[in-house]
């Protein structure tokens, strides 16, 4: 039995006593205890692939701040790693793949990994975290979106231009759709396995959907997000596991995402929550959307911006604050001040009381 079910109630647009809050990358390098754990583990993957350490890191922000959810400590690139692309990290450059997929032969060789063998460490982490949380707050599981994973798989790492995947979209769209369908199958299986292991809410991160033109987004990202929302088994009624579709730069597509079948849409700070709520039309909950850079501001500035964000949602939602989960519009950065996170969380709790 959950002692704090605010997140799940808000995602299902049910009444809550105040707006729930959690933060993308709430377990991360801005916390000195995270940096100490990483030094002990030796690497990011050394933490992510050890269920006990992944649990320790997942719980660190909850030991500091009264957050309303834990999110699994992992990486969006676990699926392609398990497909054989071999993930590694370069200091200062981020994730890379030793075996990117750039031709038909490589793409057709890909299959859906077995979730309890190749990705057992993720499921074990979910089980350990659920046990340690002991019903205090819900645990969020997650995956990267098919488009975002395909970007990394084809580019071989992060990119500014996305030249290789966009070239494939123009020159060999059928091949790219084949890859996206395979990855979508894997994402659905991955999220279902996390749910079976104990995840109580699920989020898909479409980090790079915003690099696409509207026409390309509607061809290469939206249909696959919709497939996930419609095909992922999440249960029924009060026991249904809510799904959040988050995208960077997805403001223009809120209405499309609201029609996908997901329970909630996460937006970044490039659209006002008032506008997003009007576009959503009461069909989904909304999550977001404070600019993470606000945390570089003074405590007074942070409180003011939190208030504006809460008010913006209510303004677009007929004066009601129901159906809103407070979050940042993207993940936190390593140089942010943990004390400012405390200010943010306290401000949400104080200013959103019903």
Curated annotation (Swiss-Prot):
PROSITE patterns hit by this protein: UROD_1, UROD_2
Reactions accelerated catalytically: uroporphyrinogen III + 4 H(+) = coproporphyrinogen III + 4 CO2
Q: Which Pfam families does the UniProt record give? A: URO-D
Source domain of life: Bacteria
Give the record's subunit note: Homodimer.
Q: Which GO terms describe its cellular component?
A: cytosol
Which example biological process does GO assign this protein?
protoporphyrinogen IX biosynthetic process from glutamate
Q: What is this protein called?
A: Uroporphyrinogen decarboxylase
Q: Which GO terms describe its molecular function?
A: uroporphyrinogen decarboxylase activity
Pathway assignment reads: Porphyrin-containing compound metabolism; protoporphyrin-IX biosynthesis; coproporphyrinogen-III from 5-aminolevulinate: step 4/4
Sites marked Transition state stabilizer: 75
